[in-house]
Design a protein with these regions (language model features):
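An acidic, glycine-rich, mixed-charge low-complexity segment common to nucleic-acid enzymes
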Residues: 1-38, 44, 237, 433, ...
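C-terminal structural cap/anchor segments
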Residues: 336-426
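Charge-dense, extended regions
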Residues: 391-501
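Amphipathic, charge-rich alpha-helical segments that serve as recognition/docking helices
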Residues: 94, 152-244
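Short, charged/polar connector segments at secondary-structure boundaries
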Residues: 3-150
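Glycine/serine-rich loop-strand microenvironments at binding/catalytic pocket rims
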Residues: 101-124, 293-297, 307-335
Length: 501
């Protein structure tokens, strides 16, 4: 049962709406010579433009420019009441922060010359197009609370076309109009990258009256409408749907469901991953290693999600190493490299301590989650200067490079020699058993490659090694062992070379 407080609040909202409708109607009853053409009910209509007092305007909290922000707040159970002063301040702050530098320039222009682009509102004052301009006008009247700059207060009204309906009376028609104005080709340039995906999802769910997007059952009619409204092709809108579903899955993976702010700065990586999964799932693509299956693609997605999470801690172009391009260019194209890379990744993941619980009640969830993601990255360093996730990328990038240059052994051998020359053999860590074992393993590989091509070169190399030994410097603890080995060498040479040749 709803509270008395709720009913009182609704009564006040209805009274405010009624008052706004009456006052706006009094304005629109007057004649005006200024007209603006807008698409309405399937045709381009010439509608009058009026000067609407700022106090009659109500922000649209689902404006495409800040949709990811308002949805994120609401998914934190934070109610945004656009009729209240507190709700109004939240929307204004989100609008200001969405493009601060651009807002500063536009606000100066508006203060000096007035609003140059006409907005659109409903008959009860809900802003359909022009949230940002209205916010800038309000901020000027509020002595630059957001901009921290006092500007001339010459314009205390909003130039707008007034639609003959409320939002509730014709939601689909208004959605179409709003989308065409907000997400047209010119406007999209000023929007956060995530907004267009989220906007397409919201429209699709509203048109189809669905609770979620099912990719293999997309409604063609809804896709066509969205493509018309957004000025995109059908295939582009389908790509939006695919990408948005993956974005939601990523947020679910991190338990950040509905917190769309955590998608910022990751659009390129999501587009790449969406393309990879469409390529690899369900069939064996020539771009993947031979014999991979869907469980390998599952691993690719999980690993990609981890690298999406730490996206702000490395150059985003490195993400391409996972699976971008032809098979010889990436990790997923070579079975040995992929197994090496994925095994190391999951080993690193297992070593990271369990993370603390997410504090969904924090005042700034975006900051809290960013700090949490950064801690995840820092922990992966395990006291070293570089994250093991990044080390793993770099190490396997080298292997991919070696594979691609396998037809040029001279270059690879030179690189290997230069790499070995760079090692500080006098450093104490060089004597560690693990390092010495690796050196021995490397030496065995070198000798093995020589013996297949030239036995005499191997023997010459052995003689050079024997001649380089300073007998006087052999440690006492090794003398007896050296004697045994030297006898073994003599015996081996006698029985295998003197008698055999």
């Amino acid at each position: 049962m709803q509270s008395i407080k709720y009913h009182l609040r609704q009564t006040k909202i209805n009274m405010n709406r009624t008052d706004r409708i009456e006052r706006i109607t009094a304005i629109t009853d007057k004649t005006t010579d200024w007209k603006q053409q807008i698409p309405w009910k399937g045709e381009l209509k010439s509608m009058p433009v009026y000067d609407i007092p700022l106090d009659l305007l109500v922000y649209n909290k689902y404006n495409g420019r800040i949709l990811s922000r308002t949805k994120s707040l609401e998914n934190q159970k934070q109610k945004i009441d656009v009729e209240s002063d507190s709700g109004k301040k939240i929307i204004e702050k989100l609008l200001w922060d969405s493009k601060e530098e651009r807002n500063k320039k536009t606000q100066i222009s508006i203060a000096n010359f007035g609003q140059q682009k006409v907005g659109i509102i409903t008959k009860d004052g809900i802003i359909i197009d022009g949230n940002r301009r209205a916010m800038l006008l309000n901020d000027i009247q509020n002595d630059g609370f957001l901009s921290k700059k006092k500007l001339p207060k010459k314009y205390n009204y909003f130039k707008a076309v007034v639609l003959p309906v409320t939002l509730e009376e014709n939601p689909i028609e208004i959605e179409e109009l709003e989308t065409k104005f907000q997400m047209g080709e010119d406007e999209k340039l000023g929007y956060n990258a995530t907004e267009k995906y989220l906007k397409a999802k919201e429209i699709y769910l509203r048109l189809t009256k669905s609770s979620k997007i099912i990719l293999n059952e997309l409604n063609d009619e809804a896709i066509k409408k969205i493509s018309d409204w957004m000025g995109e092709t059908n295939s582009e809108v389908r790509k939006y749907m695919n990408t948005m579903v993956l974005m939601d899955e990523y947020l679910n993976y991190l338990e950040y469901d509905g917190i769309y702010t955590q998608l910022d700065s990751r659009e390129d990586q999501f587009l790449s991953l969406t393309k990879w999964l469409n390529t690899f799932y369900g069939s064996e693509s020539k771009k993947g290693f031979d014999g991979y299956d869907d469980t390998d693609v599952d691993d690719l997605k999980t690993i990609a999600f981890d690298f999406l999470r730490i996206r702000n801690s490395y150059d985003g172009k490195e993400f391409r190493n996972l699976a971008e391009g032809n098979k010889e260019k990436h990790f997923f194209g070579n079975k040995e490299i992929w197994n090496n890379f994925s095994t190391k990744h999951f080993e690193t993941l297992d070593r990271i301590p369990e993370e603390s619980e997410i504090d969904f009640n924090t005042n700034n969830l975006e900051k809290h989650l960013n700090a949490r993601d950064n801690e995840f990255f820092e922990t992966s360093k395990f006291g070293k200067s570089e994250s093991e996730f990044i080390e793993n990328i770099n190490n396997n990038k080298t292997l991919v490079g070696y594979n691609r240059a396998s037809d040029a052994p001279e270059k690879l051998v030179k690189k290997a020699s230069q790499a070995f020359d760079a090692i500080k053999t006098g450093h104490s860590s060089f004597s560690k058993p693990t390092v010495q074992n690796l050196i021995e393993e490397l030496g065995t590989k070198v000798i093995s490659s020589l013996k297949d091509k030239s036995t005499s070169k191997v023997l010459d190399h052995i003689i050079n090694l024997l001649e380089s030994i300073d007998i006087d410097k052999i440690p006492d603890a090794e003398v007896e062992k050296v004697k045994l080995i030297s006898k073994k060498i003599t015996s081996y040479c006698y029985h295998n070379f003197d008698k055999g040749l």
